[in-house]
Amino acid sequence: MAHKKGQGASRNGRDSESKRLGLKVGAGQRVSTGSILVRQRGTKWHPAVNVGRGKDDTLFALVDGIVVMKKTDRTYVSVIPQA
């Protein structure tokens, strides 16, 4: 049995493309309706007041306003409306 694979048989060089997950907006920042706040897999951050959740668990703003984050047993993201 050959213990060499032959020329040109590269075994390395594979890596998946990054998915750019995480917070897109910090607490205290101003956002507009529809702005993406968090991209995530599962619910690391949970939607609270004026925040919607997409089918891929993305959190987005339902109103214009300021982002507020609150940590209890879970981390909640909400948007306080601004005039």
UniProtKB/Swiss-Prot annotation:
Family statement drawn from the similarity comment of this UniProt entry: Belongs to the bacterial ribosomal protein bL27 family.
Record's keyword annotation contains Magnesium: no
Chain spans, region Disordered: 1-25
Record keywords, A-Z: Ribonucleoprotein, Ribosomal protein
Species the sequence originates in: Chlamydia trachomatis serovar D (strain ATCC VR-885 / DSM 19411 / UW-3/Cx)
Keyword Chaperone carried by entry: no
GO function terms (MF aspect): structural constituent of ribosome
Name used for this protein in its record: Large ribosomal subunit protein bL27
